[in-house]
Amino acid sequence: MSPLAILISILLSLFCLVVGYYVRKIIAEAKISGARNAAEQILGDAKRDAEALKKEALLEAKDEIHTLRIEAEQEVRERRNELQKQENRLLQKEENLDRKDESLDKREAMLEKKDHSLNERQQHIEEMESKVDEMIRMQQSELERISSLTRDEAKQIILERVENELSHDIAIMMKESENRAKEEADKKAKNILSLALQRCAADHVAETTVSVVNLPNDEMKGRIIGREGRNIRTLETLTGIDLIIDDTPEAVILSGFDPIRRETARIALDKLVQDGRIHPARIEEMVEKSRREVDDYIREMGEQTTFEVGVHGLHPDLIKILGRLKFRTSYGQNVLKHSMEVAFLTGLMASELGEDVTLAKRAGLLHDIGKAIDHEVEGSHVEIGVELATKYKEHPVVINSIASHHGDQEPTSIIAVLVAAADALSAARPGARSETLENYIRRLEKLEEISESYEGVEKSFAIQAGREVRIMVKPDSINDLEAHRLARDIRKRIEDELDYPGHIKVTVIRETRAVEYAK
């Protein structure tokens, strides 16, 4: 090989080495730059993550600090409230102790004052006793000196003189005590009666002796009468009730004084009208069925009454007799309603006096039981009631209450007296019992006639169902003093000339009016 070829080979080798070196250097620098960039990126990511973790940790720390602060504040408030409560309790106890201390001081002062007063009274009594003893000794000596009496004789004379001097004072004191007792008893009785009346509400009832059966048409009247009057005669014979068929449109009137028979006839006739088959055999069947329905209704009314009043344990026959009072009236007042009212009033008054309320209601409910069958059995309703109560083994207090509520016997218990009082209250209250319209109007007219017969009376008015009369007088003719005299005179004439239940209030009104008109 020639030296030129060798030189070229060497130069090429050197060139290759130089080129390789620079290529490698470039590659190495590129790798180093990439690594540096990667490291910087990793470092940046690490810083960002660290910053995020730092912020998150700060937030969590702040939340925890806030929570701890709230809990601490809550605990502080609770402790402060507890301390405040304890402080209030201590203050209250301190105030209570102060009040007790003041009360004890007052009591101590009061006791000292009473003790001082008692000592003064004791001293005064001792002084009076010594004076009395001295006076007695002086009188004894004087009597012995004057009359030469012995000590025992003088003592007897002194005792008689003292007794005579004090007997009048003792009688006055006893009379005053008796009057006070009567006044207190009257007040207590009025209070009990007023409370009982306020707490008891009752219906006002009216008496009736007729019932009306409505008909679908007037043709039914001919069917009720029947051929030659057979149907109406059969119905009247079976029920004992008069049928009045007149010009009243679509109605038949049943007239009779026995409400049970009248109700039986009404139910029977109503069933016959609804059924349409009206002949003697059908009438007998319906009347018998109606009697059974009325009997069932009477028993139900008795049971309902005992339940409403609160009286239990009555004999079944006595309950049925009690239910018959539903169809019994006295002066227009339904006797069953009256008996219930008396039972309630008696129970209310008994509760005020501390008596047996149940027994009182029982006595009040049964006090008029005799009226249920007094038209069937001989004797007064009181006698019949006593027999029924004895027959069905009622309590002796109940029997005595029945026997004494009209004064036939003496009451032996407070309950018997209460029954009589409740009976009078129920019968005497306004509207409880009725009178005939003619007598009522005549009594009102007589009241006004008596009032207007006096000179100076301008007009009179009978009001409140005749229980009060108001007289308007002329102020120029009658002065205030004459108005009182006029009221007394009219009251006396009413008492002498009229028969009336209860009381009539006489009111004289004298009125003077002065009228002027401003123009």
Swiss-Prot record:
Endoribonuclease that initiates mRNA decay. InterPro entries: HD/PDEase_dom, HD_domain, HDIG_dom, KH_dom, KH_dom_type_1, KH_dom_type_1_sf, Ribonuclease_Y, RNase_Y_N. Residues 209-272 form the KH domain. It is an enzyme of class 3 (hydrolase). It is found in: Cell membrane. The keyword Cell membrane applies. The chain crosses the membrane at residues 3-23. Keywords: Cell membrane, Endonuclease, Hydrolase, Membrane, Nuclease, RNA-binding, Transmembrane, Transmembrane helix. PANTHER family: RIBONUCLEASE Y. Coiled coil: none annotated. It comes from the Bacteria. One of its GO terms (cellular component) is plasma membrane. It holds the Pfam family HD. The gene is rny. This is Ribonuclease Y. The lineage of its organism: Bacteria, Bacillati, Bacillota, Bacilli, Bacillales. Its EC number is 3.1.-.-. GO terms for molecular function: RNA binding; RNA endonuclease activity. Residues 335-428 form the HD domain. The keyword Glycosyltransferase does not apply. GO terms for biological process: mRNA catabolic process. It is a single-pass membrane protein. Its main location: membrane. Belongs to the RNase Y family. SMART domains: HDc, KH.
